[in-house]
Amino acid sequence: MNILITSQKAEIAGSTYSVVYLAKGLAHRGHNVWVATPTDTLLWRLLSDSPVQLVEVSFAFKFHLPSVQKVKKLVQLHQINIVNAQSSKDRYSTILARWWYKLPIKLIHTRRQLVKSLGLFGQSTFYEQGTDAIVAVSKGVKQSAKNIGISEEHIKVIYNGTPAEKYQHIDPNKVNLLRQRYQIKDNDIVIGCVARHKEQIQLLRALTEIQHPVHVLFVGIEERPKFRAVQNRWPAPHRVHFAGSVDNREVLHHYPLFTMNVLPSTIEGLSQALLEAMALGVPVIATEIGGNSELIQDGVNGLLFQNGDANTLASHIQRLIDDEDLRENFSRTGKKTALEDFSIDKMLDHYEAFFTELLETKQHH
């Protein structure tokens, strides 16, 4: 297959890494893969040393004519037969390119986050009429797309995957340096939270009910003034560390420090951070929202709580502090979930089968 993947929004986020795994994986399986994205993006940097062919397209705004024309040229020059758009502005450009130039392609949009709003008037109709299918990375994302008017039969669920090989390069020396930086002792309880724009304050509120002193390690954000007011109410001398924004290789070296990983998110599609924690054997607690409840079976390979319910979050944290056997059980079952049930190979198998099916239906017309 000749496949063009487009993405205008490619900053430090799990979704960017998911696009990288898809593009590289399809290229390694022998498909010709082009990725159209702005040059100053993380996506460009991550793919620059790979068999994927990169093309600079700005997708500066939704009706950006030069981007529409570039998509047309790419399709015609390379005889592209599958176009897979990943973010909002390139979704518009790809639909317009196909309509205006009557391009003989199959066009698929991928949704990686819960769809929160209808957007522009008629946008859901525009997306459905303009594409052959929409891929949702979880059933939760599919439901949110249905809620804004996309018909069920137009949406295909293909879960994100995580590549086992990325966990084989964790350097124990780097982990020890981080342990020293944060002054973590061997028996300390460390609650990790790897996320950018989530409801991290829920975790801080939950700690007002935890008497046992813990470390909290936020990876992905800086300290914020609103956090300080909550910390002042803590009954125990919990220690909070903010690692700020770090690249994925460095993020991975933080997980071995964690006793547990908490993800207090509100719009999760299918979290790479949860997959990473589970793959590395870290017990997980997450909001029962989006794809979180498809990754985590409550009480089997992790724990779930309702968004905003700091009391239940606190009791889950206390339970994992107290019960080492449960932690070991979640570690084992979580690892199996991430590396077997949500493997990269499974994800790529599903994309290949779906793209092939779409191309075959095209040939029947």
Name each model feature, range by range.
Residues 75, 245-246, 253-258:
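Short alpha-helical donor nucleotide-sugar binding micro-motif in glycosyltransferases
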